[in-house]
C-alpha cells in the first residue's frame, strides 16, 4: 500500500469504529483497538482496552457518532489522525443525553497487514 491508500484505510477504519460505537458492536471494536490502547476521554478519564469496551457495552449508549474531515498523516507503520468528532450519547444509568463536540488525536499502528488504534485523546470544543 502507498501513503494515500493507508490514509484512506485509516479513514475507513475510523468510520467503522464510529459505526461500531452506535451499534454497540463490541466484537468489531475489539478488533479495531489494540490490546494496549490508551483511550483518554474529553474529561480526562483514561481507559485501557477492557475498561473502554466495558464502557461501550454497559455505561454509555452512542446514539450518533460522526466525523467531519479527518487529517491522516502516515509515518511507516504508524499513522496520526486528527479531526472533529460529534457524538450524541446517553448515559445508561440516568438516561441523560449529552451532545458532544470534540477534537481528537488518534494514533493507529499497523500490525502485519492490519491497522489498530493504539491511542485516542479527545478535547472538548
Can you describe what each PLM-predicted range is?
Residues 1-31, 36-125:
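A beta-strand edge to alpha-helix "cap/lid" segment located at domain peripheries
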